[in-house]
């Protein structure tokens, strides 16, 4: 029998219904698989076993090279952790940390009371120092290096601007070489600690041409025969040769103020020499200082784990990178602070 047109329509309709049922069942199965898979991913993330995390860090140029090394070494054992690290100065690090823009702020100065009241939680992780610098082609370089500079000299040069020529200083009679001061434009620990060493001053009291960043300040002095400035030691010394950066000389401090650099005040030839002087307390504090990591309220999660690692296993990389280890009792105290912080 030949099917009528109505029978054809009915058969087609039945086929479509069968297909729809099959498709619906397939869709339901796929949805269930997706839900189960999603649940599995959520649990893994919560457990912290396989989920990737990114730690955001900003702040002091002083800590930047060390932080790069720490992050690279940490990733070798924790490849699931990613880092985004930027400089900008200690002021930026503190602001970013307190505002929640970053997980960790690198701060190369003391933590101010007003920052503590805003929830700043911090630990010291290593130590370095700020040194004065002059251009290596300064015509009076030999006399400057043998005489050094007292706190009073630096105050007259950087703060009062009452000395604008090296010949105006005691023991430099007959010298006629002008002085061009350079300082930092960004809110930073280096300028703060340099000002504190000179006297009861702050960064805003330091005069001269303002330049952004540690590398920028070093380059400005290198480019000016009559330039004088200051830098964190890892921007004043070449990390490969451990000698002062080409174009720079380190300005010795006349610590006993007797008008000359004595043998026990001469420790600037290499980075290793000044590091030893800092470690022994011969080079004063300030301008040596602790370097801090800051977060808002408390260290938690992957950030907490990372900072704990820095204070323990991470300390093995400190000296080779031009930083001075903190005493064991200080590291233990700081580690306890982190371990008692957050979750």
Model-inferred region functions:
Residues 104:
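Short, structured active-site "lid" loops
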Residues 101:
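Conserved functional loop/turn residues at catalytic and ligand-binding sites
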Residues 127-128:
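A catalytic-pocket lid/entrance helix-loop region that shapes and gates access to the active site
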Residues 41-98, 107-111, 116, 121-123, ...:
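Exported/periplasmic ABC-transporter solute-binding proteins
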Residues 1-49:
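Secretory targeting signatures
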């Amino acid at each position: 029998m030949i099917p009528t047109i109505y029978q054809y329509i009915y058969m087609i309709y039945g086929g479509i219904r069968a297909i729809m049922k099959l498709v619906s069942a397939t869709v339901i199965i796929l949805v269930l698989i997706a839900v189960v898979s999603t649940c599995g991913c959520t649990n893994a993330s919560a457990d912290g076993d396989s989920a990737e995390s990114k730690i955001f860090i900003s702040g002091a140029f002083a800590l930047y090279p060390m932080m790069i090394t720490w992050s690279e070494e940490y990733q070798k054992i924790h490849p699931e952790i990613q880092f985004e690290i930027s400089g900008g100065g200690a002021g930026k690090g503190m602001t970013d940390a307190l505002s929640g823009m970053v997980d960790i702020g690198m701060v190369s100065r003391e933590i101010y009371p007003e920052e503590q009241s805003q929830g700043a939680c911090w630990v010291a992780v290593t130590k370095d120092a700020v040194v004065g610098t002059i251009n290596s082609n300064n015509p009076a370089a030999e006399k400057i290096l043998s005489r050094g500079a007292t706190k009073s000299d630096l105050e007259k040069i950087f703060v009062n601007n009452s000395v604008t020529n090296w010949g105006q200083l005691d023991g430099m009679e007959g010298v006629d070489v002008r002085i061009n001061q350079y300082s930092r434009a960004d809110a930073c620990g280096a300028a703060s600690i340099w000002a504190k060493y000179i006297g009861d001053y702050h960064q805003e009291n330091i005069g001269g041409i303002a330049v952004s960043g540690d590398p920028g300040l070093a380059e400005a002095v290198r480019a000016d025969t009559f330039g004088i400035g200051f830098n964190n030691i890892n921007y004043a010394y070449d990390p490969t040769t451990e000698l002062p950066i080409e174009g720079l000389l380190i300005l010795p401090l006349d610590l006993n103020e007797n008008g000359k650099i004595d043998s026990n005040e001469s420790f600037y030839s290499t980075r290793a020499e000044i590091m030893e002087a800092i470690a022994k307390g011969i080079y004063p504090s300030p301008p040596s200082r602790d370097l801090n990591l800051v977060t808002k309220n408390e260290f938690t999660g992957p950030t907490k784990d990372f900072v704990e690692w820095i204070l323990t296993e991470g300390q093995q990389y400190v000296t080779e990178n031009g930083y001075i280890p903190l005493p064991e009792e200080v590291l233990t105290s700081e580690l306890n602070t982190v371990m008692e912080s957050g979750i």
